[in-house]
A protein has these predicted regions:
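…and closely analogous acidic/polar surface helices at protein-protein or active-site interfaces
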Residues: 22-39
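Von Willebrand factor
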Residues: 39-58
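Short, flexible, mixed-charge acidic loops at enzyme active sites
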Residues: 59-66
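Active-site loop/turn elements of alpha/beta-hydrolase fold enzymes
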Residues: 14, 51-53, 152
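Short acidic, Gly/Ser-rich segments with clustered Asp/Glu that frequently serve as metal-coordination loops
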Residues: 15-20
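Active-site-adjacent betaalpha module
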Residues: 1-8, 34-42, 68-188
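Short hydrophobic beta-strand that contains or immediately precedes a catalytic carboxylate
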Residues: 10-12
Length: 188
């Protein structure tokens, strides 16, 4: 069982702008919401990580792949609807950490916040499995966090990529469970 005082649940890119853009991603919201509710009940630290830019996107260089998708469409400016988290995932007052690239630890204070709070275990899930979830797992593992990925609260536009990552790649660096299996394990 995980020590709630040493555990953080990270929701990764469950933002309205991503959910509206990635077809099919809303299918994992019930599982994600169930995981968040469990974490609240267990009093895990909950941190919502997502894209957040300044007005005009000065953080994005012209040559960046983000330029076409984000800057040119004026997406994920902090305080705008596309940067908001889905209502069933985030509550007012819960910690939000913005990033400017793919991984949850990219260009922000997430690592400092986790260490300051004595966090050793990370439980997380995101949209997409091959984007933020993969990047976050790699970095968290390198930073010596013990990780759990909740596979049925992750989504990837390519189901085969999702399957390969959750069945063959992630298990080398994390425990990979369904939300129900994780809850059952923690309640046992």
């Amino acid at each position: 069982k995980l020590d709630p005082a040493r555990t953080a649940l990270l929701t990764l890119d469950f933002q309205k702008g991503i959910l509206g853009f990635v077809s099919g991603a809303e299918a994992v919201i019930p599982n994600a919401a169930k995981a968040v509710e469990f974490a609240r009940r267990k009093q895990y630290q909950i941190i919502h990580v997502g894209l957040g830019f300044s007005t005009g996107h000065p953080e994005i260089p012209e040559h960046s792949p983000f330029n076409r998708r984000v800057k040119q469409n004026n997406l994920f400016v902090k305080g705008t609807p596309s940067a908001e988290f889905h209502d069933s995932i985030a509550r007012p007052g819960e910690l939000v950490v913005f990033k400017q690239r793919v991984g949850a630890f990219s260009e922000n204070q997430l690592h400092l916040i986790l260490r300051a709070r004595g966090i050793e275990h990370l439980v997380f899930f995101g949209i997409s499995t091959s984007g933020i979830t993969l990047s976050t797992l790699r970095r968290a593992f390198d930073l010596d966090f013990r990780c759990v990925v909740l596979k049925d609260a992750c989504f990837d536009a390519d189901p085969e990529v999702h399957r390969i990552l959750t069945e063959k790649v992630f298990p080398a660096q994390a425990k990979v469970l369904t939300v129900d299996a994780f809850i059952a394990e923690q309640e046992a």
